[in-house]
């Protein structure tokens, strides 16, 4: 009986061992198969990346990839500007505004590249002058520099009239007011100056009388005078460029060529015919009212007025306006805003 019991126990032990070995061998074989499959996939990927003759599989391009990679987008997915500009359905849509803005920006860039690619002979411009309401208009040239090339471009042709200019062009009233708002966010009115240029003296005098009806105005009116017009030599142009950029060591000869003025005959000065009007004010309220007056004149006479705005290096404040300046800025910088609201 004892021998039979020992035999049975030995058999059971062998069966358990065999079952364990079968399980471990199965797991080992499965792991080996998985590793071999992974290695084959990795080798195939490496071969596909290294081989130059492999062609990528063409997949349909969705709108997300078209937005990120526009060079891989088909023609029907791309932004169709003509569709949004001409279709009546998009008359009041933002897509119409976006397409118009993109088209206008491309047009301005093309116009500027055409303008800058050609050399400039002078900075003179022709403009009809209204000496009175009954006399005829005359053409006045600003300088005596003659054109050397027929393909040269007039520098002031880039500035269009207020009626035909786009809303974001350099001479538009919208751009002029946006620059005033931008400067007023950083500086006060004592550092900002409005400049008006025109050949029509009657128009400048009318604008001066209109501005004098606004309080706290400081106006400087005069006609521009130019000295004798001469051309610079290439050595002078290179010297002044090197002087400012610091590409070469600043020697005495370089400073002399850069700083020494070109002597001309002072008796050859002459009046250009352009009247300039400089406007300053101690407060933002006064200067903003003056800007609206200038814009109204520019809209009524678009071809005869040029507006400009400048930021001064130091405040221009008269003694009569110091108390006005202090009382106006007291509520902004010193006291609490709650006092104004109450």
UniProtKB/Swiss-Prot annotation:
Biased composition (Basic residues): 14-25
Biological process terms in GO annotation: regulation of DNA-templated transcription
Superkingdom assignment: Viruses
Signal peptide from the UniProt entry: none
Region span, Disordered: 1-33
Residues forming coiled coils: none
InterPro entries according to UniProt: Herpes_IE2_3
Transmembrane segments: none
Protein family according to the UniProt entry: Belongs to the herpesviridae U84 family.
Protein name according to UniProt: Protein U84
Organism encoding this protein: Human herpesvirus 6A (strain Uganda-1102) (HHV-6 variant A)
């Amino acid at each position: 009986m004892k021998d039979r019991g020992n035999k049975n126990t030995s058999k059971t032990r062998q069966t358990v061992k065999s079952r364990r070995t079968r399980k471990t061998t199965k797991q080992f074989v499965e792991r080996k198969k998985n590793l071999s499959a992974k290695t084959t996939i990795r080798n195939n990927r490496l071969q596909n990346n290294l081989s130059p003759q492999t062609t990528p599989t063409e997949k349909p391009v969705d709108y997300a990839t078209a937005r990120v990679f526009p060079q891989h987008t088909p023609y029907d997915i791309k932004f169709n500007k003509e569709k949004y500009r001409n279709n009546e359905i998009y008359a009041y849509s933002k897509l119409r505004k976006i397409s118009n803005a993109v088209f206008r920006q491309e047009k301005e860039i093309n116009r500027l590249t055409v303008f800058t690619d050609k050399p400039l002979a002078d900075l003179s411009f022709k403009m009809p002058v209204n000496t009175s309401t009954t006399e005829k208009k005359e053409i006045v040239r600003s300088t005596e520099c003659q054109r050397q090339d027929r393909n040269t471009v007039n520098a002031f042709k880039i500035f269009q009239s207020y009626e035909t200019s786009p809303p974001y062009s350099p001479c538009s009233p919208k751009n002029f007011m946006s620059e005033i708002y931008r400067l007023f966010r950083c500086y006060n009115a004592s550092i900002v100056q409005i400049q008006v240029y025109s050949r029509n003296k009657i128009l400048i005098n009318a604008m001066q009388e209109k501005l004098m009806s606004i309080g706290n105005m400081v106006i400087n009116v005069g006609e521009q005078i130019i000295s004798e017009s001469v051309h610079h030599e290439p050595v002078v142009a290179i010297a002044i460029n090197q002087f400012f950029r610091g590409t070469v060591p600043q020697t005495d000869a370089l400073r002399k060529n850069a700083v020494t003025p070109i002597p001309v005959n002072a008796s050859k000065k002459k009046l250009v015919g352009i009247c300039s009007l400089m406007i300053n004010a101690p407060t933002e309220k006064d200067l903003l009212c003056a800007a609206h007056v200038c814009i109204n004149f520019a809209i009524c006479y678009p071809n005869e007025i040029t507006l400009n705005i400048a930021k001064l290096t130091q405040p221009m404040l008269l003694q009569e306006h110091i108390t006005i300046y202090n009382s106006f800025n007291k509520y902004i910088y010193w006291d609490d805003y709650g006092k104004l609201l109450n």
